[in-house]
Structure formats: C-alpha cells, structure tokens
Amino acid sequence: MPRRRRVNLKAKGINAERELVHLFHKFGWSAVRIAGSGSSKYPCPDVLAGNGFRRIAVEAKLISKPRKYFSQEDVEQLYTFSKTFGCEAWIAIKFPDTSWAFFNPEDLEETASAFVASKDMIEIKALTINELLEVG
C-alpha cells in the first residue's frame, strides 16, 4: 500500500475515534482516545469511556465494505485489556452515512482464521449509542 494512502486511512481512523470520543461526551460520559493503540506491544483499545458506574473499552472501525475481519489476536487483546482494566469490551463500527453501531465481541462470527462482523450481523445484533449507554 502506498505511503500516502496509509496516512489517509490512518487519519480517517483517528478522526473516527475522535468522533466517538465526542459522542460519549455528548451523552455525559468521559472518554479518551488512546493514541497509537493499534501499534502498541501492549493490549489497548482505541477509546476508553466511563460514567462513574460503567467503564467501556472500545475498538473502533470506520469501514466501507460489508464485512470487517478481526484477527484472533485483536479480539484476545481487547478481552485481555478489558479483563485487566475491569471494563466491558465493545466493538464500534461505522459505515459511511450511518450512525455508530456497537456490539459485543462475542457476536463476531468465527471463521477458520479470523473473526468477522458482517453488515447483516451488525443490523441484527448491534446497539445504538442510546442503547449502549442506556439513555432515553
């Protein structure tokens, strides 16, 4: 992949994570984006959010294809961090021109070599931000 395209994809991911942080704040939660989360040797999510009662670790993905693949290592690291930190593990996916969709990593479909989130699965099992945060 050419360097310019990699930088653009990285910038889109960073902006998506920042959008998610703003969304949590809009609902009265505190949230932070963890810079370099995908390149750390230690397990860490993209976003941490909490409201004094609940803590959530979020792996955030902005995607345009109908399926998103996650390596077994990615899923294990999210679980490892969440268990050690004492928080819930969630995956957030945003398709173009849609709202964020949140789902538990347990909802991922397992293939021979990876886990996959399909658009169909997301439409059936995902929560909106209101449902995730139990607002309204």
PLM regions: where:
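Conserved catalytic cores of phosphodiester-cleaving nucleases, focusing on short active-site segments
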Residues: 24, 47-64
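Short, charged, amphipathic alpha-helix that recurs within catalytic cores of restriction-modification
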Residues: 63-94
